[in-house]
Amino acid sequence: MRAMDQQEARAYVEALYEKVAQRWQERVTEGEFMQEFAAGRLPREVFALFFRNWGAYTIEINTLTACSYQRFLPFFKQHPDLMAALGDAIADEFIHPQPPGHTLIMLRTAAAFGLTREDICERPMLAECRGKLDFARALLYEGTAAEWFSLKSGEEMFGRWAGECYEILTTKYGLTPDEATFFSKHHEADLEEHDEGVIGHAELNRATLQRLLETGQAWERPTYGIEYCALTFTDLHGLVLQSTLQAARRERLLQV
């Protein structure tokens, strides 16, 4: 891909994020899971089923973000500002509030749904949740830096979604702010500067993709590419939620 000037690259990234936001609206916000959850009609046991799988997912996806530091190190060595910001973001995931990091926050929210560490760490994920994770894993090791950081556009939408979930859980499902801390923390970490100056993850992802475009290093593979990877990762989040409902019906947590 040819190098873009700063204004063109910024506009390209903004247009991509607008497409991702629209797809999230269609596949996640307007999906059955979120419609029922937002209305307070989703049984607590069904959300617990989702969170058992999602908790396991978060542990593994954070390790992939750490691996991206090594995988794309030649690029980051050219851009010490981004290298420092990514190092900060990775450290944030693993040392706050204390090692092993955000996993402790996730387990606090899991406990509010009666889930144990063993439930999260020792039970297999739903196939669709595993599929989302393994799409990211394959893209990290087989894809380009631009494809990876386009996939990471989902982090901005997840941050917004986490804020919505926090509001729903604390107003309609009786969770305390401390019990719902996984969602408030991720809303903050993804969208805001936090923990003594750590850049919001979404801002870092935008800046990295923009720099790849500006330097002519935003390479894409046939049948993959920047837009496909961004939108597919969003589609897979919707699929995870829908598959939770299907599993809940199989387990008779919901009426068929």
Q: What annotation goes with each model-predicted range?
A:
Residues 2-256:
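Non-heme di-metal
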